[in-house]
A protein has these predicted regions:
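N-terminal cap/leader regions of alpha/beta-hydrolase-fold enzymes
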Residues: 1-209
């Protein structure tokens, strides 16, 4: 299944929105709604459906543990198949970009290298994107990546390594922790979220229309 948000008028293009470890929850739905309000068809595929249908939690420590447990049951290849299906559906609206947050940032980074049909990708603090294995991937579309300098999961050294290995990738660092874009988390950083969002939108306008 997937959450779909349609723009009011003719779409400028499409954005596939990839969830965090918390499922396609109210926050991810609101992110998709936001891109629809900016003129894009937004589709958020429920990547956890393969392991547990309709999984959706909040942000307590217990929720984090539950989310991680389900994530561990979803193989990357399976997730990328679902991304591919979403890209195919979204293509009716024009060029397709992908944006992902946390685990979804990792999925978006891998999709940029492995899923055909993407015009651009925007991973937000993708956990796992700074491993040697992920850095060895070769993105086949334009990429803009957002990271927080205070991210306790992703060391800045790793981000610098990724940036050095991929000069064509635009990498932005913010004085913020992991999850800074999510206004339902304690780690929310309004100023960084706003700046990252405006940069992402500008990037989508350039790459998608």
């Amino acid at each position: 299944s997937a959450y779909r948000a349609d723009p009011a008028g003719k779409p400028r293009g499409a954005v596939v929105v990839i969830q965090e470890i918390f499922g396609v929850n109210s926050h991810i739905r609101s992110v998709a709604d936001g891109y629809a309000a900016d003129g894009y068809l937004a589709i958020a595929p429920a990547l956890y459906d393969r392991a547990q249908r309709n999984f959706e939690v909040g942000y307590t420590p217990d929720d984090i543990a539950k989310g991680r447990a389900v994530k561990d049951k979803v193989a990357l290849d399976a997730a990328l198949k679902d991304v591919q299906a979403a890209v195919k559906t979204a293509a009716s609206a024009g060029k397709v970009g992908i944006v992902g947050y946390c685990w979804g940032g990792y999925v978006a980074w891998m999709a940029a290298a492995r899923v055909p049909g993407l015009a651009c990708a925007v991973p937000y603090y993708g956990g796992g994107t700074t491993t040697d294995q992920a850095i060895a991937e070769k993105p086949k579309c334009a990429v803009m990546a957002h990271y927080g300098e205070k991210d306790e999961h992703i060391p800045v050294e790793g981000v610098k390594k990724l940036a050095a290995a991929h000069p064509s990738v635009t990498v932005h660092l913010y004085p913020a922790p992991h999850g800074f874009n999510c206004d339902q988390r304690g780690s929310y950083d309004a100023a960084s979220a706003k700046l990252a969002r405006s940069r992402t939108l500008e990037f989508f306008r350039k790459q998608l229309g």
